[in-house]
Amino acid sequence: MKKIFLFFFAGVVLASCDLNFFPSDELNSDALLQDEAGAEYIMDGCYSLLKDEVEFLGYSSGNTFTRHFFQMSEFPADNCNLSSHTTDPLYEATALKMTDNLKNVGTLWMVGYKVIYMTNTIIETLVEGESADSDHLLGEAYFVRGWMHLNLATLYARPYSHGRDNIGIPLHISTNNAVVTRAKVGEVYDQIVKDLTKAS
């Protein structure tokens, strides 16, 4: 009799469970794109990607955008000296031996375009002039998109002073994930100026 009661009780308890398949501490993309509060979460995510460690090629320790950007922009310019050889990718940057399979090179590219995609999501979602808060978020999104394109162009394209017709970087100005060919340096810098002007 005890077993029957136990099975009956277990059946009632399990049958009354209402499983919540979506975690209550997370938002899905549809929920984020409904209002400016969601856009603010996306913008916060952009800033988090710039400072947080991300995993790339199996590495995550010290793998941050800001660290690698500093390594790849300052170390090759003789602004610092290393006392010995190291296996850290920072040495490769110092020795100008940067290849696409190094974690610092790949991390900057990956995080840079993730942030650009997130800013494009905000730009496509919010309507300019709807409120002061949405205009502020749009300004942030345009600024960060322009700034990220500038950082990527600085590291992966020929300098602007070498000519506007040189090959630049892929220019992403929408959330369309189609493969984009590399734009010319002049086109990239024109878009950077346009974004930064729009942000102000």
Q: Residues of each region from the PLM?
A:
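Bacterial Sec-dependent N-terminal signal peptides
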Residues: 1-27
